[in-house]
């Protein structure tokens, strides 16, 4: 892939060199210094570009082992630092040192599911020195936990699937499924990259099959699971930036199998749901939600919440007001949403892979069609 990388990078640099002098530089009356983590990720680069285009100074950080990330060389980056992994004891002090040295005004974590916890922990350490666009530990644990998230939403009168906390396989075996209109699925509450895609429907055909299935899962009080209604329908994913309960920036797109393609999909019902949820919890930070519009009743249900940056933020690549959404403490007159002129975003290698596999599939289907038309020998 090196030749392709080199060719694409060279073309992009050439275009940038030609067009850069003609681009209007935005000025701000109050320039800030912004610290962004997760430097190797595309969403971190997108945020860096948005802040830089708005006239702010951008500091990018990443773990030591990713010191050579190409993003450090972006024109949007003023300084680059490496820090220990988020779970390392020295991580909080490393971030604090950068905040103090660079006089950082706002810290915007761009983190993984695991790292989001440590950025919530470090919030209390950084808060006396800068604003932190991340939820606190208590809120993070409440939102990350699929069951407590569903319980909170339901208490606010917001629509979620029927959900049950499971700490012992016997709870599922003894559950009375009679009279339930929908099947159920069971998911690990702690993040499980392997089993998260298992959508086995419960109950199984027999009690014995149900028992065999749930007894094979690592369910315990220490590792609880959630049994939730299975709702077939159109799935949506979102990214929202919230300050003191005000929804400042929001985007929504249809979910896909690999979730590497993003095209804006206007869903006012989802926006209203998130606005209510954010206000009730007085959230500050970045949150992303998964929703599904049910095939059977056409209603919109929130499935889960991930309190961190979503890659759908890339849909704001040409929006001039992203920085305002992150920096303004007061509610904006209108929510920042992808421009009508913005095109869908995608990842080049995935498009190449899809092009190749689609062609293979077409050839196989063509061959199968040809064979099916061939006369059988007598």
Feature-to-residue mapping (PLM):
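Flexible, glycine/charged-enriched surface loops at secondary-structure junctions
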Residues: 226, 286-288, 335-341
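Conserved metal-phosphate-binding beta-hairpin within the catalytic cores
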Residues: 240, 279-315
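Positively charged, low-complexity/disordered segments
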Residues: 364-377
